[in-house]
Amino acid sequence: MKKLLYIDLFCGAGGTSTGVNTARLHGEQCAEVIACVNHDANAIASHAANHPDALHFTEDIRTLELSPLVHHLQKCRTKNPDALVVLWASLECTNFSRAKGGQPRDADSRTLAEHLFRYIEAIDPDYIQIENVEEFMSWGELDENGKPVSKDRGKSYIKWVNNVKKYGYNFTHRILNAADFGAYTSRK
């Protein structure tokens, strides 16, 4: 019986899902990714080949009809009644990252985190985990040229965090350096 059931948004080809599914407690699998969403058909095809037991949606998270996901979650909860549900989102980071340099940001892409509230309301997860670059915390308004407005630095992020808390969640964050976990990069 699984202790954690994961829904993986922005699942890509499945790196996070592989990590979740290989988690062990006392030698037994303790977590399972049960559903995945990604807009890229090639990524979903790769993910499905590696994780055939998960339900896959090739769709933008903003437009996905959530009732099939909710129904699937209900079935999985029936099989694992004591399991906690985790909503995992590896939000698109390009339009927050320093790696974008001085290029204009895509305002629509920067609002993807706001669309998570639909999922929170529909599936009522026990936990929410977000993975992104540290610049996500500087999320604010953009000017007419698509450049971040320095006086608004972090305001949209703080508003978003406060909205997460309104659903009754505690909120903590950590900045991790990939190099500290064996990766050949110092990406945070």
Q: Which ranges hold each PLM region?
A:
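N-terminal Rossmann-like NAD(P) cofactor-binding module of classical short-chain dehydrogenase/reductase
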Residues: 86-88, 129
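Class I S-adenosyl-L-methionine
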Residues: 67, 72-81, 93-188
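Conserved SAM-binding loop of SAM-dependent methyltransferases across substrates and taxa
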Residues: 13-29
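Conserved SAM/SAH-binding beta-strand->alpha-helix loop
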Residues: 40
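Extreme N-terminal starter segment of soluble prokaryotic enzymes
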Residues: 2-6
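S-adenosyl-L-methionine
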Residues: 45-81
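Short beta-strand element of Class I
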Residues: 33-34
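Class I SAM-dependent methyltransferase "Motif I" SAM/SAH-binding loop
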Residues: 9-14, 91
